[in-house]
A protein has these predicted regions:
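Conserved beta-strand position repeated once per blade in WD40 beta-propeller domains
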Residues: 47-49, 100-102, 168-170, 226-228, ...
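A short, acidic, amphipathic alpha-helical segment used as a generic capping/interface helix at domain edges
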Residues: 293-305
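Secretory targeting and sorting signals
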Residues: 1-22
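Beta-rich carbohydrate-recognition and catalytic domains
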Residues: 23-96, 105-162, 172-222, 232-290, ...
């Protein structure tokens, strides 16, 4: 299984901007959305790309089959069906694990046809959390079918196949008609884990990656892991949800968090204005979730990566129990806080 190390999502939209900063209120009682055990008896689902609509769609990193640690990407329609929509096959660069989806609306020309949606995903070719790269699949609608482009859009950056590499992509539309998105991802190497971002353009066919940069850290932390962003156009502000640190000690698992942190930053600060950093807005703890581990979160977003409702934030997170069966207890929940 590919364990998420760090993820960053960003957005660049040509919309009216404001420096307004909203306050995040208290979090609602969590609502259970889905667990792989609902379908497989003994499975896992986490790292949601949550798309608002009727129904809400959850694209997740999901066990391929019961009692199997091999990642496919599933689509769950909340209150309805759950099916595998992307899987590793054959002998290519992504034939083993397919994980950590991020779905956005953007035009992508491929093989003589222009598709309307892109799914960025982590793929690898080993039965390990290593040698990861980022690919993209395309579809005419949110339900698929999804067709993989042949090559990674972000290639493995390491020098040894035992290194983690590049993964946990998150993307937001810049201009859907022109085929441009901002793609952000984790680079995990022996030197450390960093968030990176770039513009990806599909306008001329094969993806072109430009303006690559390292993303700012949060506070005094040495890394950004397991987080997602959503953009508020009227405020010109990014809201982030991430796994809190330090990770728990004295009990297992110790590689996922027991709380989430919400922070925000202005658009200018996100894109590198000196002296502008993240503001911590809120925390979601086990006192709210009621479970030993609270991890791998995402925001409920529009197909463009913006807030569906400018007056609230909705987080979709993964809960878990203690080992030895923590993995098989993964469950997706939703909680909402007012934004004023």
């Amino acid at each position: 299984m590919i364990r998420r190390i760090a993820a960053v999502l960003t957005v660049l939209l040509l919309l009216p901007l404001s420096a307004a900063h909203a306050t995040v209120g208290g979090w609602s009682t969590p609502i259970r959305l889905y667990a792989a055990s609902d379908l497989q008896g003994r499975g896992y689902a986490y790292a949601p790309s949550a798309v608002a609509g009727s129904p809400t769609r959850l694209y997740t990193c999901h066990s391929r089959a019961a009692n199997t640690i091999r990642d496919d990407i599933f689509l769950t329609k909340v209150g309805g069906t759950s099916t595998s929509v992307l899987t590793g096959t054959g002998s290519g660069w992504d034939h083993f694990h397919n994980c950590d989806p991020s779905v956005v609306r953007v035009n992508v020309p491929f093989n003589g046809h222009t598709y309307s949606y892109a799914m960025f995903y982590l793929g690898n070719d080993v039965d390990a959390s290593a040698h990861n790269a980022i690919g993209v699949a395309v579809a005419d609608n949110l339900d698929g079918p999804w067709l993989k482009l042949p090559n990674p859009v972000i290639r493995f950056p390491g020098s040894s196949t035992s290194e983690w590499g590049a993964g946990q992509p998150t993307a937001t539309t810049i201009n859907a008609d022109q085929g441009t998105v901002v793609l952000a991802w984790t680079q995990g190497l022996p030197s450390g884990n960093i968030g990176k971002a770039a513009q990806v353009s599909f306008g001329s066919g094969p993806p072109i990656v430009q303006f690559e940069r390292v993303l700012p850290m949060v506070g005094e932390d040495n890394g950004l892991n397991n987080f997602d962003l959503v953009y508020s156009p009227p405020r010109d502000r990014f809201y982030m949800v991430r796994e809190g640190h330090p990770y728990p000690s004295g009990s297992q698992p110790d590689y996922i968090s027991d709380h989430l942190q919400i922070a925000s930053i202005s658009g200018a600060g996100f894109w590198g204005t000196p002296g502008v950093g993240w503001t911590v807005e809120s925390t979601i703890t086990s006192a709210r979730t009621g479970t030993p581990r609270t991890h791998n979160p995402g925001f409920l977003r529009t197909i463009y990566g913006t807030l569906p409702n400018e007056s609230e934030l909705t987080v979709v997170y993964t809960s878990a129990g203690y080992d030895p069966d923590s993995l098989w207890s993964y469950t997706l929940w939703q909680t909402t806080a007012p934004l004023s």
